[in-house]
């Protein structure tokens, strides 16, 4: 009635020699023999952390004439680091006999190497045509080549052991990551190695400065060309697992060992994912500008200008870019079938950025000044978003397998000598071809609008006293066409299983179509005020306060955007408008320096002698910061929409009159929405705790004559040890909902330090 899978044990629980896989034996033989007593934790080893850092700078200055000057500067740095990967796997040196037999590196676990080479060249020529007309020309380049690789990089380690199909490219050399249950894993380094991103910048610029009457004019041109190779991997050399599955008792699930699984040559799971070859993106942009600082009269100055910018879409030098055509539901390739080298992404030539500012001395006394301004600034899309177009099918390989726990057909279980099928580079074009591979697809908006910022300010500054200044300002900004990533193949709420509802998606057999689209925006409004006291009578201070609000549509519906994430559904992105993840409503800062009124030229103890040396020279300073918390989302611990986003319904505000870290918000104010519907709660509706921090320094200066001074100082960071609580558990239905169990990263406990310094 209840059949069970049985596995016959080997006689005497010893694997017969004819059942030991030769490749499994090879892999087992590269483990070093124990050098410590016991049957576990019986090998100890250590490796040095070796750093070699050198560099130099050169500069040449030359005056061709009194009106023509030139300089050239060159910088170079070469950094090398050979370091243990971590204590858990540090470090397994390759046995000498194994190194003679196989093509292995110096270590079979635990070492990674980093190489960083940077160099830069700058050329500058300045020519004075007239005292009021100057031209400055600049050009140069900068190159960075950071590389991190495993200790056996370049060795055909897997191939020499008999594991075929692993060392298929020059970046897939070395050992695979071999995880053997109950044993230290074998690997020349972390799975994602090697990484070899490279970046080279070339730039040319020219600026003309012209002073004419009340005008200070500046004209200029700027051109940049970048060659970027964001070569990164996730599992270059593959991962092979050898758990107890195939050698334990299937009834009791005991007695197995990963080493036995390795020796019989069957892997219990594996994966690999990597770029076939590095790809090189070329990025170009140029700009010209005109700026006029016009002193209208002694009380009014205007700043008027305009800047025009062009950002050409990225190209790959060998056209290895793929984009998704949402109109025809197909993949397109750079330079093929009439598709541009930028895979359809347009270039925008109307990126004009006007700028206007003014400064007005209201009464002509210099004590009351009003300043204001408005400007538009364009900026290129972050490279990480566009570069992904070269990190998808067919330029990347992704393979994985997980056999049955108790297989009945062992021919379907991958063996260690040939764990993966051959790599085939296929360019799917039709929907059917794409669906057959069932990959994650990435697409970028073909319109490719250029992101830009609009900023505006109005500032009133009033001198209250010769040492005191008060300022109040309004600052606003709006960002348009910010990059936004979301799953365009989103599953909508509905009855039935997730698999059955995929038939209603644009591509039914593809889980995710990640669309990169400049549809996001943000807006900020802030009131800023500060009171400044310049140094007098031993005291100076600055008191500032900001009341602000920042809103956007979220970080990314595909990957989340911090504590406030992205919108609940792409069908109504505007409903995701809410506080930005970095929004802080109130922030106040007080900084001060106070010389205590004791000692020479002070009010008290103003007499020479030891009493003056003891009582005088004391200085107290500090910074006090007060901030409110940041927003966070409320979610559900258990899904109710069969795979669709899980946000709750909000039935009341959800805040508490006296919250504490154990119960920060009212969890009963949020309930699961009805089945197959979206919740009505917004983004970032609740805020985490605020924080107060006191940093204080006490300094004592003792002078000995005119040439020697002894200084003692005591510094206290977070003087009162005030905890900076983090975000609460906001998963409705969780046993710890509303509870805060962490503090903010970057704000430490109280830290005291003392220093003594002698100056002579």
Language-model features, listed with the residues they occupy:
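Flexible internal linker/loop segments at domain or repeat junctions
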Residues: 662-676
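Short acidic-glycine motifs
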Residues: 1-658, 680-760
């Amino acid at each position: 009635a209840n059949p069970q899978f049985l596995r016959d044990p080997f006689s005497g629980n010893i694997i017969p020699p004819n059942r030991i896989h030769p490749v499994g034996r090879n892999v087992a033989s590269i483990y070093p023999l124990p050098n410590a007593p016991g049957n576990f934790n019986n090998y100890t080893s250590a490796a040095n952390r070796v750093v070699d850092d050198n560099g130099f700078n050169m500069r040449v200055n030359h005056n061709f004439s009194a009106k023509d000057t030139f300089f050239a500067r060159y910088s170079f740095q070469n950094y090398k680091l050979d370091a243990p990967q971590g204590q858990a796997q540090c470090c397994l040196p390759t046995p000498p006999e194994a190194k003679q037999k196989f093509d292995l590196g110096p270590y079979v676990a635990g070492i990674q190497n980093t190489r960083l080479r940077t160099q830069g060249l700058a050329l500058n020529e300045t020519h004075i045509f007239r005292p009021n007309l100057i031209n400055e020309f600049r050009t140069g380049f900068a190159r960075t080549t950071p590389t991190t690789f495993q200790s056996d990089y370049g060795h055909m380690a897997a191939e020499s052991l008999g594991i075929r199909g692993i060392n298929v490219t020059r970046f897939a050399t070395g050992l695979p990551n071999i995880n053997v249950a109950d044993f230290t894993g074998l690997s020349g380094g972390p799975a994602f190695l090697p990484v070899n991103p490279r970046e080279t910048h070339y730039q040319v610029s020219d600026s003309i400065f012209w002073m004419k009457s009340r005008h200070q004019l500046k004209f200029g041109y700027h051109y940049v060309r970048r060659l970027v190779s964001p070569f990164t991997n996730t599992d270059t050399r593959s991962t092979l697992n050898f758990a107890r599955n195939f050698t334990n008792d299937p009834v009791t699930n005991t007695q197995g060992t990963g080493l036995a699984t390795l020796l019989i040559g069957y892997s219990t799971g594996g994966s690999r994912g990597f770029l076939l070859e590095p790809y090189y993106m070329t990025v170009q942009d140029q700009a010209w500008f005109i700026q006029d600082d016009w002193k209208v009269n002694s009380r009014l100055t205007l700043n008027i200008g305009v800047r025009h910018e062009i950002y050409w879409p990225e190209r790959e030098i060998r056209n290895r870019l793929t984009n998704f055509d949402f109109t025809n539901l197909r993949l397109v390739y750079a330079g093929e079938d009439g598709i541009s080298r930028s895979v359809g992404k347009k270039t925008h030539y109307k990126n004009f950025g006007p700028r206007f500012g003014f400064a007005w001395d209201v009464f002509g006394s210099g004590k009351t000044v009003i300043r204001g301004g408005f400007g538009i600034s364009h900026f290129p899309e972050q490279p990480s978003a566009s570069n992904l177009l070269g990190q998808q099918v067919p330029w990347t390989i992704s393979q994985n397998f997980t056999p049955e726990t108790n297989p009945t057909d062992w021919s379907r279980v991958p063996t260690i000598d040939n764990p993966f099928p051959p790599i085939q580079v296929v360019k799917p074009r039709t929907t059917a071809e794409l669906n057959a591979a069932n990959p994650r697809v990435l697409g970028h908006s073909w319109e490719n609008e250029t992101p830009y910022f609009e900023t505006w300010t109005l500032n009133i500054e009033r001198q209250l006293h010769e040492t005191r200044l008060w300022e109040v300002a309004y600052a606003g900004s709006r960002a348009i066409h910010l990059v936004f990533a979301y799953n365009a193949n989103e599953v909508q709420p509905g009855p039935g299983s997730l698999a059955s509802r995929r038939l209603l998606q644009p591509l039914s057999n593809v889980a995710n179509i990640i669309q990169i689209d400049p549809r996001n925006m943000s807006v900020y409004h802030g009131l800023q005020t500060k009171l400044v006291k310049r140094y007098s009578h031993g005291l100076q201070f600055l008191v500032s306060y900001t009341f602000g609000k920042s809103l956007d549509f979220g970080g990314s519906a595909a990957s989340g955007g911090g504590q406030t994430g992205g919108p609940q559904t792409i069908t109504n992105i505007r409903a995701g408008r809410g506080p930005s993840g970095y929004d802080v409503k109130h922030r106040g800062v007080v900084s001060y320096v106070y010389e205590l009124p004791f000692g020479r030229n002070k009010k008290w103890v103003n007499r020479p002698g030891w009493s003056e040396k003891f009582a005088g020279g004391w200085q107290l300073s500090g910074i006090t910061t007060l901030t409110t918390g940041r927003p966070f989302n409320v979610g559900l611990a258990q899904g109710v929409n069969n795979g669709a986003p899980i946000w709750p319904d909000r039935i009341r505000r959800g805040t508490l009159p006296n919250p504490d870290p154990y119960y920060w918000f009212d969890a009963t104010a949020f309930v699961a929405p009805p089945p197959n519907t979206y919740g009505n709660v917004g983004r970032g509706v609740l805020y985490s705790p605020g924080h107060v921090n006191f940093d204080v320094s006490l300094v004592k200066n003792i002078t000995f004559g005119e040439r020697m001074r002894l200084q003692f100082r005591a510094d206290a960071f977070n003087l009162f040890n005030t905890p900076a609580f983090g975000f609460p558990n906001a998963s409705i239905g969780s046993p710890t909902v509303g509870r805060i169990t962490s503090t903010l990263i970057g704000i430490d406990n109280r830290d005291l330090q003392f220093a003594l310094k002698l100056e002579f």
